[in-house]
Amino acid sequence: MTRISPLQKARYGYVPKLPPVLQDEIARIQAELGQPTEAVADREDLKRLFANTYGKPIATLTRGSNPEAGRRRTVGVILSGGPAPGGHNVICGLFDALKKANRESTLIGFKGGPSGILDDEWIEFTDSLINQYRNTGGFDIIGSGRTKIETPEQFAKALENAKKHGLDALVIIGGDDSNTNAALLAEYFVQQGAPIQVIGIPKTIDGDLKNEYIEASFGFDTATKVYAELIGNIARDAISSRKYWHFIRLMGRSASHIALECALQTHPNVCIVSEEVREKNMTLSQIVDQIVDAVVKRAAKGENFGVVLVPEGLIEFIPEVGALIDELNTLLAKEAEVFNRIDDPRERISWVKGKLSGNNQHVFSSLPETIQAQLLMDRDPHGNVQVSRIETEKLLIEMVSSRLKALKEEGAYKGKFSALNHFFGYEARCAFPSNFDADYCYALGFTAFVLIANGLTGYIAAIKNLARPAVEWKPMGIPLTMMMNMEKRHGKMKPVIRKALVDLEGAPFKRFATQRDAWATESAYVFPGAIQYYGPDDVCNQPTMTLKLEQGLE
């Protein structure tokens, strides 16, 4: 028999908070539709690609009447991409809402991600199974995967298996790529005359699936709290031993939301924000200068220790390196067959050097061989460089160390520099969800079903007013096409949901920018400690600093 921890046992008893409108009978909740919407960019291209689902109105859930809510339904659900804390509660909320509307309705889960609907691997959810996963971390209830449904054969197979199960709707829980898939499936089903609704759920710990209506993706709250605890622990170790500089790489390939939130929570000496690097056209050398400046100033005060936060995707945001990666992605997509026949790593490097254009060839040649090799490792499923394999923090340590050595020889630096590197990634993906994520995810699952009960398809579930107590939350449905634009993938233009980057004019970054100079020279660390689930509201129910600052509550 599997043992469960006392905390897990206690969390089974936690009852997630719902906004008032979702506490009503499902038949008394209606979707109030607004005006037609437009995509964020590339509107004509997207109108052609989504001829049946483009331009839908925003749906706001309000009290009203929905006579169709109680009919018997079969709904499928898929967990897609990397795990994020709270995924199980989305499924629990979806299950509870569906059963509240009609006990005879059925929820089935496709196993292992989108491949589950293609291979027809599935389970039916029961009360006893659902109850084992309430308020727990992970995606293990059905597993996840990164398969993309993109070929005509895959779309046809997904439809065939959906019809086989008599699906009325399919809910896809995932990030920007997964929700792009949801939009494409919704369009395909309508095109084929199949009355199968598709609803997306915004998931990603990176925090880059957000906009005016999606205030946060689920998992971001928990993940940043886990990382902030670890950073705080390391900062406390730094001021205890007083001899190490800790370089910490954090998740966030496409945006620096995690690094920024963790900086606001812990006050490191240096935090690099990738978006600022790109905006200021900074070189790798200038980033090194910024870190060296902090090291030298702190050494002058006798403080040969510190904490540096580095976003996982930094290297792509350095314009000169970003241009290189863009060309590499295109080159290796076009010439994959030839490249894959070369086994020796050094021969691969030499072959690539010969294919790159002028400045990109120069930048590639200037990087240490270890970084060159990492840039040429296996692509991710979308054909891009696997940025998490690039150990940027080690590159920075090497370059900072070299610069300090030169300064010491000039007599401009008299301190000691001993660096340790860390990468925080998997540690947070399956953590017990914070109270915020437990509540938010349960409400998202509930919202998804109410959107289904109102006959909507091609929408993503959303909740507004997240920085305030759940009693003030407002559930909505946002048209997926509204968030899309065209981007180059595998060397071709494809419709995708636009990633949200750190807004350099936004309140979170501005707060950070006003304080970072003081943090660089002082040891002003804050120690958040572990996530708390019980106790006063200011200890266990606080949203992220990012949310509070964005909504003017901090």
Swiss-Prot record:
Tell me what controls its activity. Answer: Non-allosteric.
Superkingdom to which the source organism belongs: Bacteria
Residues binding Mg(2+), per UniProt? 176
> Where is the major localization of this protein?
cytoplasm
**Looking at the keywords, is Magnesium present?**
yes
Which pathway is this protein engaged in? Answer: Carbohydrate degradation; glycolysis; D-glyceraldehyde 3-phosphate and glycerone phosphate from D-glucose: step 3/4
Transmembrane spans: none
Q: Which reaction does it catalyse?
A: beta-D-fructose 6-phosphate + diphosphate = beta-D-fructose 1,6-bisphosphate + phosphate + H(+)
Where in or outside the cell? Cytoplasm
Magnesium as a keyword?
yes
Q: Which residues bind substrate?
A: 204-206, 243-244, 251-253, 312, 426-429
A Pfam family (short name) is: PFK
Write out the residues that bind diphosphate: 82
Q: How does activity depend on pH?
A: Optimum pH is 5.0-6.0 for the forward reaction and 7.0-7.5 for the reverse reaction.
Positions of the catalytic residues: 206
Q: What is its EC number?
A: 2.7.1.90
Which residues of this protein are annotated with the site description Important for catalytic activity? 203
UniProt subunit comment: Homodimer.
Function field: Catalyzes the phosphorylation of D-fructose 6-phosphate, the first committing step of glycolysis. Uses inorganic phosphate (PPi) as phosphoryl donor instead of ATP like common ATP-dependent phosphofructokinases (ATP-PFKs), which renders the reaction reversible, and can thus function both in glycolysis and gluconeogenesis. Consistently, PPi-PFK can replace the enzymes of both the forward (ATP-PFK) and reverse (fructose-bisphosphatase (FBPase)) reactions.
Protein name per its UniProtKB record: Pyrophosphate--fructose 6-phosphate 1-phosphotransferase
Organism expressing this protein natively: Spirochaeta thermophila (strain ATCC 49972 / DSM 6192 / RI 19.B1)
